[in-house]
């Protein structure tokens, strides 16, 4: 999979590389008021510990700007060297100019070309932000969004479209304007002297099919590393499915160097859900491994017992519980594949494909459960202690398979 990646320059955000041959980075964004130092620091730590490699926070006013250096200081005091991205709209040029310590504390600036102002002021504000980034050696993400397109650019492209022999739909022109907005800003930044190794590009929409078209165009027209994500994925299952549907085609084509899943969290749901989903998408596509994986069948009329479901749940829980210690002791354990299957139809075959797997008896089958490791029959379990015995075998397998080489 990694060999299919679209070639780009490498951009370092803090110590995290984006683009080139580097792993696709997982990002997230806080939803706390940045001016609230305690709450924002706590949420950045929570996101980072969940696996977010880069965290973005809004810098929308002077109080937020003043808070950024203290947030950074507290994170470092906790041993969290997580890169922080400042999200600027409307007044970013003013805040970066007035609060240099804030600018220094950030690891990347996000600039939306649609929220910089109008006319010549837009160009001046953009130029000032790029100059500050260059002076400090900071990378920039030019992040266009179809919800905040420059009206002048949209009007220009609508007028041009009206003169075509066969005009495109208004929706198609909006998507073209989104790409054009991002590309023009990217080219302007390069002309000002910002290096290719300091530029990341994004252009977000809220529909999966549209996102695929937009990013294929960005990949065709630029060499920049690309930040993928729907601008608003939505809540729950809908948001998860929409994000996976939008990102998977692009990632499988080698397009995309960092991702963020913009879920709307349900009341009381942790913000870290977006990190978990982003990791699951990358792992499902075989692009990264973050944690051991459990494969289990959905069940059917042959699996009248719920035991295989209970065992799959218990194995998943135990792997998650053991992962912090395993990571420290057994390099590569994130690659572990475990199968928990419910009957003889696919059970043995799926178990052989996993590192270690168990095929439980289905309805009418002999009450025994063969266990396979590395494609070979390891043992056959029987009786009441199958669950605990299988978990012990998994633990032993990890110690043997992933033990550091002497």
UniProtKB/Swiss-Prot annotation:
Enzyme Commission code(s) on record: 1.17.7.3
Tree of life domain: Bacteria
Taxonomy of the source species: Bacteria, Thermotogati, Deinococcota, Deinococci, Thermales
Molecular function (Gene Ontology), one example: iron ion binding
SUPFAM superfamilies to which the protein is assigned, alphabetical: Dihydropteroate synthetase-like, Nitrite and sulphite reductase 4Fe-4S domain-like
Species of provenance: Thermus thermophilus (strain ATCC 27634 / DSM 579 / HB8)
Residues noted as binding [4Fe-4S] cluster in the record, renumbered to the chain: 297, 300, 343, 350
Entry's cofactor comment: Binds 1 [4Fe-4S] cluster.
Annotated protein name in UniProt: 4-hydroxy-3-methylbut-2-en-1-yl diphosphate synthase (flavodoxin)
Family according to the record: Belongs to the IspG family.
Cofactor(s) the protein needs: [4Fe-4S] cluster
PANTHER family for the chain: 4-HYDROXY-3-METHYLBUT-2-EN-1-YL DIPHOSPHATE SYNTHASE, 4-HYDROXY-3-METHYLBUT-2-EN-1-YL DIPHOSPHATE SYNTHASE (FERREDOXIN), CHLOROPLASTIC
């Amino acid at each position: 999979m990694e060999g299919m990646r679209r070639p780009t320059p490498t951009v370092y955000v803090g110590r995290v590389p984006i683009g080139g041959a580097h792993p696709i980075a997982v990002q997230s964004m806080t939803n706390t008021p940045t001016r609230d130092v305690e709450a924002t620091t706590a949420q950045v730590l929570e996101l980072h510990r969940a696996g977010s490699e880069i965290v973005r926070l809004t810098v929308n006013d002077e109080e937020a700007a003043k808070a950024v250096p203290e947030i950074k200081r507290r994170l470092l005091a906790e041993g969290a060297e997580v890169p922080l991205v400042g999200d600027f709209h409307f007044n970013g040029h003013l805040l970066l100019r007035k609060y240099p310590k804030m600018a220094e504390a950030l690891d990347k600036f996000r600039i939306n070309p649609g929220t910089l102002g109008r006319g010549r002021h837009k160009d001046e504000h953009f130029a000032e932000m790029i100059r500050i980034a260059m002076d400090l050696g900071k990378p920039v993400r030019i992040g266009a969004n179809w919800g905040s397109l420059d009206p002048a650019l949209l009007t220009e492209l609508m007028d041009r479209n009206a003169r075509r022999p066969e005009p495109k739909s208004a929706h198609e022109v909006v998507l073209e304007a989104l790409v054009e907005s991002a590309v023009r800003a990217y080219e302007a930044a390069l002309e000002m002297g910002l290096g290719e190794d300091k530029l990341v590009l994004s252009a977000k929409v809220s529909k999966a099919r549209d996102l695929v078209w937009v990013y294929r165009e960005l990949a065709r027209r630029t060499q920049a590393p690309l930040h993928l994500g729907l601008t608003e994925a939505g809540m729950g299952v809908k948001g998860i499915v929409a994000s996976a549907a939008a990102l998977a085609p692009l990632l499988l084509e080698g397009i995309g160097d960092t991702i963020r899943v913009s879920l709307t969290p349900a009341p009381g749901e942790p913000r870290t859900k977006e990190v978990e989903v982003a990791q699951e998408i990358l792992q499902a596509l075989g692009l990264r491994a973050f944690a051991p994986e459990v494969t289990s069948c959905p069940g059917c009329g042959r699996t009248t017992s719920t035991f295989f479901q209970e065992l799959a749940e218990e194995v998943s829980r135990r792997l998650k519980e053991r992962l912090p210690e395993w990571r420290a002791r057994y390099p590569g354990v994130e690659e572990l594949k475990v199968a928990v299957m419910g009957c003889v139809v696919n059970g043995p075959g799926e178990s052989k494909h996993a590192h270690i797997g168990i095929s439980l008896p289905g309805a009418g089958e002999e009450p025994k459960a063969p266990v396979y490791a590395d494609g070979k029959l390891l043992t056959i379990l029987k009786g009441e202690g199958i669950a605990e015995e299988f978990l012990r075998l998994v633990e032993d397998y990890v110690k043997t398979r992933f033990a550091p080489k002497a």
